[in-house]
Amino acid sequence: MSETNQVQNHAFASDNAKILQLMIHSLYSNKEIFLRELVSNAADAADKLRFKALSDNTLYENDGDLRVRVSCDKENNTLTISDNGIGMNVDEVIEHLGTIAKSGTAEFFSQLSGDQASDSQLIGQFGVGFYSAFIVADKVTVRTRKAGDSATDGVEWISAGEGEFTTAKIEKTNRGTDIILHLKEDESEYADDWRLKSIVTKYSDHISVSVEMLTAEVPAVEAVAEVTDEKDNVTRPAADAVDAIPALWEPVNKATALWTREKADITDEEYKEFYKHVSHDFGDPLLWEHNRVEGKTEYTSLLYVPTKAPFDMYNREKQHGLKLFVQRVFIMDDAEQFMPTYLRFVKGLLDSNDLPLNVSREILQDNKVTQAIRKGCTKRVLKMLEKLGNKDADKYQGFWDEFGQVLKEGPAEDHANKEQVAGLLRFASTHEDSTTQNVSLASYIERMKEGQDKIYFVVADSFEAAKNSPHLEVFRKKGIEVLLMSDRIDEWLVSHLTEFDGKQLQSVTRGGLDLGDMDDAETKEAQEKLEKEYDSVVKRIKASLDGKVKEVKLSQRLTDSPACIVADDDDMSSQMAKLMASVGQEVPDTLPIFEINGEHALVKHVADEQDDDMFNQWVEVLFEQAMLAERGSLKDPASFVSRLNKLMLSLTK
């Protein structure tokens, strides 16, 4: 290797420098994982070369024996991880080693809590990989050359992990990457072969690429003639000379792709470690399923559900998906075609015998084999979650708290599995009036009142707004359970999930209320009498609110509040209008239905008001109060306050 030249200084982005320092301190308690990360990256580089070489065999440069090598130098307190994989050119070095995360750093920082344990978990999900080297090293040197480039196109990258790094062009005869860790003084344990071997065996047995370490050198032994000790009369036999045995590179891992082994031969610990390899998550998975499918379409799948959600889970544009292998040859990361977007949290891999080795993302898009595998994997994940929900409610609740909002995308995206996805959903409800979303649609149906044929729900901006909605009053009075929905996605969900198990989902804020057999004859008779009594008042209110409401009705849903607004059956709900407006969509103008409570003292007072101006003022205040309760804001709050003040003053005279 020639001397480095053309040294250039670079700075990490400010957010990346912060992450680097935070990571070094937060992960210190489990620092040995740095070696797992570096070996995993080296194995990935070998996999990527194997794939590229399918179409260009010259990339092997007459060396097709792919491996990772781990070595140390006690005297200089260094540790080196080398691979003969794909390597990098200077642009790739700056892109991959100069940027800890290409996007999402602001969102990442917003989720940090200051608690070391939880922040450590989050950092693990962030996927720091290579940068974990700085946990034990005060300087890292990377020397790399991309396969196919000339020996003079090597690159050297050096950083002390303090916010900046240098790059220089070097000569590198062998392709691939060497990472040299200049260990901190108190981290010399990682310059010990036995310690390194124990870590590699612990974390990297499942990697299909051979991880090699040097054996100890055995010195030569000279020949010895037969000697008799006359004093003790003991004869020592002659011994031939033994040649020195040089240090040799030998595999220290099994180097067998874990997913190709029989399930019965794989321990839970091995499955957990393999999850960390494919996901770069530092925590254990919640669930996993390992299956070999034979028949018309043959493939092996190993699917994991994480315990914790990644910080950028709600970014639907971010690449997600499974690692794809064809006939055990790595093809690509993030093959999103095999898993629907609402299951983007699922990690793992697929190994297919029915796809071509030169498969591309474009070929995968409309491939019958892809569709069959996607269908099978989706059902497998849903079945895995269903089983967990039935078997361990507490564990499932933990899953729901992490991934529930993403799962709610399912009914809109996956029509074929809509009913099964709906069975996995959980909601808060008036059954407990708790913010905890632990009510399934099946358990709601089990508690339905005699004569009830609908699943009732309310959607609001917050749990408190949903729980205290005036639309719930008659339901609380009759003991009818209502689902309380306040997640941003809930309105979108119920627009696609209209029934479950033959029961229609019905919004309590939409259309006319018909409780059917749950209303007794006496209640219906009293309602009809009240409607006749208020017929002229309703007409007078409608005239007062001309152009602002579609209709005025005597309410059947109010018991404590004077008035409320509801959406007509065919109109957009308030929550859907807000959702569309928040993403810049044009929202059509629709008029609400205004319902009044004929038994309420305020409504009776308004009904008796003979002065037209005062009547109109009262009607406006009741209407704006109802709008405020339903939508959370008014177009002209100043006029509302002025009217309210005027009416309160009139009551003091």
UniProtKB/Swiss-Prot annotation:
Residues 1-361 are annotated as: A. GO terms for cellular component: cytoplasm. The keyword Protease does not apply. Residues 579-653 are annotated as: C. It comes from the Bacteria. GO terms for molecular function: ATP binding; ATP hydrolysis activity; ATP-dependent protein folding chaperone; unfolded protein binding. Homodimer. It is found in: Cytoplasm. Residues 362-578 are annotated as: B. Coiled coil: none annotated. SUPFAM superfamilies: ATPase domain of HSP90 chaperone/DNA topoisomerase II/histidine kinase, HSP90 C-terminal domain, Ribosomal protein S5 domain 2-like. Pfam families: HATPase_c_3, HSP90. This is Chaperone protein HtpG. Molecular chaperone. Has ATPase activity. Keywords: ATP-binding, Chaperone, Cytoplasm, Nucleotide-binding, Stress response. Belongs to the heat shock protein 90 family. InterPro entries: HATPase_C_sf, Heat_shock_protein_90_CS, HSP90_C, Hsp90_fam, Hsp90_N, Ribosomal_Su5_D2-typ_SF.
